[in-house]
Amino acid sequence: QMLTEMARMSLADGLVMQIHPGSLRSHNPRVLRDFGRDKGADIPTATDYVRALKPLLDRYGNERDLTVILFTLDETSYARELAPLAGHYPVLKLGPPWWFHDSPEGMLRFREQVTETAGFYNTVGFNDDTRAFLSIPARHDVARRIDCRFLATLVREHRIGEDEAFELAPQLAYHLAKKAYKL
């Protein structure tokens, strides 16, 4: 399997592997014809992580020197597949909401659906690979505000203490991404 071979090479090179599945590219042929690729005619699709990642996880799932960061456009997989996989396999981390879900409500849905099973430390906080360079500060500000909103809700509901929320906030804003990407 190609992903398993890529994981082997990432481990050998000390690199972090990212997987971004679930987009049917250039869905609208007229937009593709008239304007070319990457013009907004991409559509999220369902993704089967459990079966698709099985060969990779059988071989490298418990490898502590490899990090595989999973992103998704299929929000239905957060609680059903991604959180349980990341909670079980040390190699896996969950990337933040991406593309269509890179929005305040999308970020909140992510936290609500993955935290119970995967916890906070099996995610990578917020990272950004946008081509819209000037939007990066605003996007990170939104992510920090949503994470703090989520933590405040947990404190209000007495699910975590205020001191724990104060410890988690800088982890989510900075330290988890730095650690996941070995920076």
Identify the meaning behind each predicted range.
Residues 18-22, 69-73, 94-98, 120-139:
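Short acidic/histidine-rich active-site segments
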